[in-house]
């Protein structure tokens, strides 16, 4: 691995609905450690399915913790807080299906409650500021409480790149 000094490494993904040859969007993430640290405070700076990490750093950071739907984000922030060096390759590493089920799972009162609880943990640990907490929960409330087709539009058309 070229990036041997990194503890946590991922990359970009291409998203499709039914046909892997018909890409509908791309989820590009920051590639440099400083940009990743800043981005991670509001949104996940890693595409989970592309991630590899060093086991010793995961254990040093406390391993995965309970946080339904947010385990990865909590782990990434805990690893950064424990001193992990991070990076993302500036490459599409895999294609990912993003059907209606994904958009349905990211909505509703239960999802919003779990999201708020995880963000509250991050706030209490000093991993995010109160303003970042308030802004992210307010935005997520709007997204979580809108109909699934609106959420799909937000994710595919507004939060992702077309090329």
For each predicted feature, which ranges?
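Conserved donor NDP-sugar-binding/catalytic core segment of glycosyltransferases
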Residues: 1-25
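Catalytic beta-strand/loop signature of glycosyltransferases that borders the donor
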Residues: 11-12, 86-93
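Short, flexible, basic/aromatic active-site loop/helix in glycosyltransferases
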Residues: 12, 26-44, 59
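Short, well-ordered alpha-helical scaffold segment located
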Residues: 15, 56-60, 92-95, 102
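Conserved nucleotide-sugar donor-binding
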Residues: 47-61
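Catalytic core of nucleotide-sugar-dependent glycosyltransferases
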Residues: 84, 96, 104-129
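Terminal low-complexity segments of carbohydrate-biosynthetic enzymes
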Residues: 140-163
């Amino acid at each position: 691995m070229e990036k041997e000094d990194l503890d946590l490494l991922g990359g970009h993904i291409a998203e499709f609905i039914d046909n892997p040859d018909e890409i509908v969007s791309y989820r590009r993430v920051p590639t440099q450690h400083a940009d990743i640290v800043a981005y991670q405070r509001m949104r996940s700076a890693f595409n989970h399915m592309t991630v590899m990490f060093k086991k010793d750093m995961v254990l040093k950071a406390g391993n995965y913790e309970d946080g339904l739907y947010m385990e990865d984000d909590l782990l990434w922030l805990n690893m950064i807080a424990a001193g992990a060096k991070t990076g993302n390759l500036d490459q599409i590493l895999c294609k990912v299906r993003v059907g209606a089920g994904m958009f349905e799972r990211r909505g509703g009162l239960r999802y919003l409650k779990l999201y708020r609880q995880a963000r509250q943990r991050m706030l209490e640990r000093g991993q995010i500021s109160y303003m970042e907490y308030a802004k992210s929960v307010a935005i997520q409330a709007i997204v979580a409480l809108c109909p699934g087709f609106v959420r799909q539009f937000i994710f595919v058309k507004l939060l992702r790149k077309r090329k």
